[in-house]
Amino acid sequence: MGVKLKDIIQPEQIDFKDLKGRAISIDAFNTLYQFLSTIRQRDGRPLSDSNGNITSHLSGILYRNSSMIEKDIKPIYVFDGTPSYLKQETIDQRRQTREESEKKWKEALAKQDTQEARKYAMRSSKLSPYIIESSKKLLTMMGIPYIEAYGEGEAQAAYLVENGDAWAVASQDYDCLLFGAKRVVRNLAINSNLGDLEYYNLKRVLDELDINREQLIDMGILIGTDFSEGLKGVGAKTALKLAKKGELENKLAKLQEESSHDISEVREIFLNHNVNTNYKIRWKKPAKNDIIDFLCEEHGFSQDRVSKACDKLKNLNSSQKSLEDWF
């Protein structure tokens, strides 16, 4: 998912203590997919309650956020809105991949090949209206604010950083940098196997590559984005060489000849995305009893574990601090 920039940008390693007291805008869809993909049983089956409702995402939301809040990290979730029509091809491709993976997952289950089953199960994850709405419901009970983006959640999350409402964006996708996020944190997981936290400062990234943001966006378009296919044979390293030689425009012109849509529209999505500016951010006192009723009574969670997780939410108390106190 997203633009493949890993080969040309180097992260800084940071620790959770470096995020203490910080507000972090979290790409909700990206994070929910992560929960649904990784929080599964050995054979790839997602966690579910007695009625067959998936609960992997609820487990992830409760335990990851309670651990972050215990470390004095303040999450703000950002949910995607209506996708651009330019993203439809990517959406269709992902749907096809999920369907094919689900078929292979079931075949592996029939063969009792748990390793293969889990591999394909992770690729079959999808966000249903139930998963999205139940996630918002739990976040509200936990006192964690969320914002509805008009379009791409990554663009909205980047805007929160630009506007001073969050310190960094948390997402696995490098697209956040193209959307102008000043700071990006990857692998924001507690006790996961995703590896160490990775931190990217946009200004430092651009300085080290000796390019500007507009060039980074054009490089992304040549590599390929969620909104358009790239130019065949052009990866991150080749795109960077083209930028250094001043040949981006020539290659973009060639790509435009092959493309069915106006590439300038893709550039505009990254440079001037329509964002929601009418929002309020407030962390509230968690509703512990409601959380226990929702997770334990409705979805069969362990009351002891849920209660302990709720106790970690004590930093979100009724005496609300101002945003400035978190920076």
UniProtKB/Swiss-Prot annotation:
Pfam families: XPG_I, XPG_N. Binds 2 magnesium ions per subunit. They probably participate in the reaction catalyzed by the enzyme. May bind an additional third magnesium ion after substrate binding. Residues 1-98 are annotated as: N-domain. Mg(2+) 1 binds at residues 27, 80, 152, 154. Structure-specific nuclease with 5'-flap endonuclease and 5'-3' exonuclease activities involved in DNA replication and repair. During DNA replication, cleaves the 5'-overhanging flap structure that is generated by displacement synthesis when DNA polymerase encounters the 5'-end of a downstream Okazaki fragment. Binds the unpaired 3'-DNA end and kinks the DNA to facilitate 5' cleavage specificity. Cleaves one nucleotide into the double-stranded DNA from the junction in flap DNA, leaving a nick for ligation. Also involved in the base excision repair (BER) pathway. The keyword Magnesium applies. It is an enzyme of class 3 (hydrolase). Interacts with PCNA. PCNA stimulates the nuclease activity without altering cleavage specificity. Residues 319-327 are annotated as: Interaction with PCNA. One of its GO terms (molecular function) is DNA binding. Its EC number is 3.1.-.-. The gene is fen. One of its GO terms (biological process) is DNA replication, removal of RNA primer. This is Flap endonuclease 1. PANTHER family: FLAP ENDONUCLEASE 1 (PTHR11081:SF9), FLAP ENDONUCLEASE FAMILY MEMBER (PTHR11081). Mg(2+) 2 binds at residues 173, 175, 226. Belongs to the XPG/RAD2 endonuclease family. FEN1 subfamily. Its cofactor is Mg(2+). It comes from the Archaea. The keyword Hydrolase applies. SUPFAM superfamilies: 5' to 3' exonuclease, C-terminal subdomain, PIN domain-like.
